[in-house]
């Protein structure tokens, strides 16, 4: 029997890097909502009293970027007396956006391998490798450690926003260690929560007293509600629970650490349980395969697991800049497949169109901000891009495709047995 502990982390929307992801995706939403053909590569930097947005944009949209950025920062919770050196109203907002390089644009506008099919005309916006993953740890087919870390981070933000724990400030991190036996989760070993807070907590000013109070409150208001519907729950006696191990966390957010777009790519995906191609998501329009192809790879992997063709599935895609069709497609089922990896790969090649233009069209990636009232990608920029039933993400809806795959596999087996 193999036994091991696997750990994943998440961060709240007030973490400096996550502020940047949300700002970059808010810029993307605003541009696509007016002009769905916008080309966007927006990077954000935050530090004490400063937010800079930079990158490349080609669009017919008219956006007040400074107003937009301030609204995102305010919504996260950095405003007024609790802003801590990074106030939505008073921070400097700098905008340095250029147009997309014509050398890149020509390859995206017309793929090198197009053959008259309109979907062939959209070439990949860059070379790269992307991974998608799914497993049957949870109902949303995500690894349990990252799923639970996100639950805790979201609940931590929720009790701050609703005033249940009024001393909490926006910055925070969670980390969960899960015990696996034979690759199945059997216990929650450790939960770690680091959360920014006011210098005094409900009349308590000494460091030990503050830490004890926060520990008690977080178990009651964060851990228990976040895990209430899980079959595998933490146990107050058996699960190690660590809160603010350094003692206090008063200085946080951009005042404590600079933030950058794209520095939480493992948090955004599978918590390290699957491989990652290295490309970030936020601030990138759908022609960037770092984003769109990673969504498609997750869709494929989730379809395979939902269809019962594997308990775990990892899909690798690779692309060349300016070329529509993937350079390679590979499926790995880690010995859990109902059929071989080669057969799974053949099923994927036969039943999924993984050209960028086809991915964009299938998931309506250019239209989603417009269809959802001007906001879509910003909501994916915190608490993960996958396994999010709260967001109704098109790449998570696999019911129909999984059924088609199952039928195709059954037909394939029937034909094989008749030979």
From Swiss-Prot:
GO terms for molecular function: ATP binding; magnesium ion binding; methionine adenosyltransferase activity. K(+) binds at residue 43. GO terms for cellular component: cytoplasm. InterPro entries: ADOMET_SYNTHASE_CS, S-AdoMet_synt_C, S-AdoMet_synt_central, S-AdoMet_synt_N, S-AdoMet_synthetase, S-AdoMet_synthetase_sfam. The keyword ATP-binding applies. One of its GO terms (biological process) is one-carbon metabolic process. Binds 2 divalent ions per subunit. Binds 1 potassium ion per subunit. It comes from the Bacteria. ATP binds at residues 15, 171-173, 248-249, 257, 263-264, 280, 284. L-methionine binds at residues 56, 100, 257, 288. It catalyses: L-methionine + ATP + H2O = S-adenosyl-L-methionine + phosphate + diphosphate. Pfam families: S-AdoMet_synt_C, S-AdoMet_synt_M, S-AdoMet_synt_N. Mg(2+) binds at residue 17. It is found in: Cytoplasm. It is an enzyme of class 2 (transferase). Its cofactor is Mg(2+); K(+). Residues 100-110 are annotated as: Flexible loop. Keywords: ATP-binding, Cytoplasm, Magnesium, Metal-binding, Nucleotide-binding, One-carbon metabolism, Potassium, Transferase. Its main location: cytoplasm. PROSITE patterns: ADOMET_SYNTHASE_1, ADOMET_SYNTHASE_2. Its EC number is 2.5.1.6. Pathway: Amino-acid biosynthesis; S-adenosyl-L-methionine biosynthesis; S-adenosyl-L-methionine from L-methionine: step 1/1. Catalyzes the formation of S-adenosylmethionine (AdoMet) from methionine and ATP. The overall synthetic reaction is composed of two sequential steps, AdoMet formation and the subsequent tripolyphosphate hydrolysis which occurs prior to release of AdoMet from the enzyme. Homotetramer; dimer of dimers. Belongs to the AdoMet synthase family. This is S-adenosylmethionine synthase. It comes from Prochlorococcus marinus (strain MIT 9303). The lineage of its organism: Bacteria, Bacillati, Cyanobacteriota, Cyanophyceae, Synechococcales.
